[in-house]
């Protein structure tokens, strides 16, 4: 069953990340153990914009991947089979950055869990701004 998680407090009860590394503002849809759709609202107040890049702020690609992974982690951690686990990056395949993400953008991430076997898993994700693809990748993860 699909549900939304609109309260940041509820997201913080699911994910272990905290400022400045909590990169999910809202979950629009989650099907535990299958998929999640979440939002990152990008503002000029993000700490990474101080150095990336002064005078031309662009959200770092690695943080787009991290935000995507956090949305995927919601799909994992809302499945009672994985409650209390810690999903961690094990690899990234096929990462592509299609357009820069700028202050004022709202990135909508969609992540589908492809498989989980034992403590390892694979997911496919994408991020869009105004319906345009900005990032996509396959994420390999380990559950600790």
From Swiss-Prot:
It is found in: Cytoplasm. GO terms for cellular component: cytoplasm; membrane. Coiled coil: none annotated. InterPro entries: FabA_FabZ, FabZ, HotDog_dom_sf. It catalyses: a (3R)-hydroxyacyl-[ACP] = a (2E)-enoyl-[ACP] + H2O. GO terms for molecular function: (3R)-hydroxyacyl-[acyl-carrier-protein] dehydratase activity. Keywords: Cytoplasm, Lipid A biosynthesis, Lipid biosynthesis, Lipid metabolism, Lyase. One of its GO terms (biological process) is lipid A biosynthetic process. The active site is at 52. Its EC number is 4.2.1.59. It is an enzyme of class 4 (lyase). Involved in unsaturated fatty acids biosynthesis. Catalyzes the dehydration of short chain beta-hydroxyacyl-ACPs and long chain saturated and unsaturated beta-hydroxyacyl-ACPs. Belongs to the thioester dehydratase family. FabZ subfamily. This is 3-hydroxyacyl-[acyl-carrier-protein] dehydratase FabZ. It comes from Carboxydothermus hydrogenoformans (strain ATCC BAA-161 / DSM 6008 / Z-2901).
């Amino acid at each position: 069953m699909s549900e939304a998680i609109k309260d940041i407090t509820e997201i913080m009860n699911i994910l272990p990340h905290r400022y400045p590394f909590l990169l999910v503002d809202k979950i629009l849809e989650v099907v535990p153990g299958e998929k999640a759709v979440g939002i990152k609202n990008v503002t000029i107040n993000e700490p990474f914009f101080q150095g990336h890049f002064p005078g031309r702020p662009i959200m770092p690609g690695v943080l787009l991947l991290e935000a995507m992974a956090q949305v995927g982690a919601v799909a994992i951690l809302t499945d009672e089979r994985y409650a209390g686990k810690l999903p961690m990056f094990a690899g990234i395949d096929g990462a592509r950055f299609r357009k820069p993400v700028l202050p004022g953008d709202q990135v909508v991430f969609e992540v589908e869990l492809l498989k989980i076997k034992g403590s390892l898993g694979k997911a496919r994700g994408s991020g869009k701004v105004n319906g345009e693809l900005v990032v996509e990748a396959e994420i390999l993860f380990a559950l600790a």
